[in-house]
């Protein structure tokens, strides 16, 4: 299967970017920074604890823009958004650090993490062990591995590097073939199902529902993309999916944390359910 055009462009640029970063700061220095970073906050555990109680385990995303939608939020202050998400009941944060396609930055992750007590995933296109060590150096608690962007050997190498520096791994799949590869190659408990097709950028929540029966019960399913309203949340919860990665619905809201609380915790006659941020 050929790599989709948008993803191919992103990956080609990412390879150049990694080379540029390595030329600026060598691996030994990044490793030193990683060793001196604050201790990881336990990204996987934060999600697993919520899901075990059958409460929404929300990874709330801090994302200024995307290739398909352009700028999502003009007033973009990561620290402010992070505090809002924490108050709204998020379990974890996701921060985009890709510069060229998502207008992200390493600084956004640092600012967001410093402003709250939540664990943070570095949302980027990971293709080199250097990026994994770098993620820990800038304060990330977890990294994303996108199966469609990696072969099995590299995927395993990146996961091993993550483990060596204390990072959790969220592996992202979109179809049955990718899921099979992920389950065979990695032992991470976190399996993300991207409802957005990276070939077409179309979104369907059926992607998560179709793949659910193939996922072992000891893995936590994180449904990603396309959760826009209460009906979407209930569709997942009735299928015992309690972990969600949501960005666009929050980024377009005046108060992202309030929108999170409304979408996930305010229901059944207005009663707020489980909205404590711990």
From Swiss-Prot:
Keywords: Amino-acid biosynthesis, Aromatic amino acid biosynthesis, Decarboxylase, Lyase, Tryptophan biosynthesis. GO terms for biological process: L-tryptophan biosynthetic process. Its EC number is 4.1.1.48. GO terms for molecular function: indole-3-glycerol-phosphate synthase activity; phosphoribosylanthranilate isomerase activity. It catalyses: 1-(2-carboxyphenylamino)-1-deoxy-D-ribulose 5-phosphate + H(+) = (1S,2R)-1-C-(indol-3-yl)glycerol 3-phosphate + CO2 + H2O. Pathway: Amino-acid biosynthesis; L-tryptophan biosynthesis; L-tryptophan from chorismate: step 4/5. The keyword Lyase applies. It comes from the Bacteria. PROSITE patterns: IGPS. InterPro entries: Aldolase_TIM, Indole-3-glycerol_P_synth, Indole-3-glycerol_P_synth_dom, Indole-3-GlycerolPSynthase_CS, RibuloseP-bd_barrel. The keyword Translocase does not apply. NCBIfam families: PRK00278.1-2, PRK00278.1-6, PRK00278.2-4. Belongs to the TrpC family. HAMAP family: IGPS_B. This is Indole-3-glycerol phosphate synthase. It comes from Pseudomonas aeruginosa (strain LESB58). The lineage of its organism: Bacteria, Pseudomonadati, Pseudomonadota, Gammaproteobacteria, Pseudomonadales.
């Amino acid at each position: 299967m050929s790599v989709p055009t948008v993803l191919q462009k992103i990956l080609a640029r990412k390879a150049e970017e990694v080379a540029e970063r390595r030329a600026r700061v060598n691996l030994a220095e990044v490793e030193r920074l990683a060793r001196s970073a604050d201790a990881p906050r336990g990204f996987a555990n934060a999600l697993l604890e919520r899901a075990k109680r059958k409460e929404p385990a929300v990874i709330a995303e801090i994302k200024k823009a995307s290739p398909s939608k352009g700028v999502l939020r003009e007033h973009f202050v990561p620290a402010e958004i992070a505090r809002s998400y924490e108050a709204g009941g998020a379990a974890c944060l996701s921060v985009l650090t890709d510069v060229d396609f998502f207008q992200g930055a390493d600084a956004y992750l640092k600012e967001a993490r410093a402003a709250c007590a939540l664990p943070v995933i570095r949302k980027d296109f990971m293709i080199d062990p250097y990026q994994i060590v770098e993620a820990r150096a800038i304060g990330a608690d977890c990294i994303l591995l996108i199966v469609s962007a990696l072969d099995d050997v590299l995927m395993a190498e990146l996961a091993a590097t993550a483990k060596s520096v204390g990072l959790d791994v969220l592996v992202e799949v979109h179809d049955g073939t990718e899921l099979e590869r992920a389950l065979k190659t990695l032992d991470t408990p976190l399996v993300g199902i991207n409802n957005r097709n990276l070939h077409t950028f179309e979104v369907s929540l059926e992607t998560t529902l179709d793949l659910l029966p193939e996922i072992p019960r000891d893995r936590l399913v994180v449904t990603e993309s396309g959760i826009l309203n209460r009906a979407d949340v209930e569709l997942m919860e009735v299928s015992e999916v309690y972990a969600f990665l949501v960005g666009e619905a929050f980024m377009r809201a005046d108060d992202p944390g309030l929108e999170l609380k409304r979408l996930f915790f305010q229901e059944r006659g207005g009663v707020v359910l489980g909205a404590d941020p711990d």
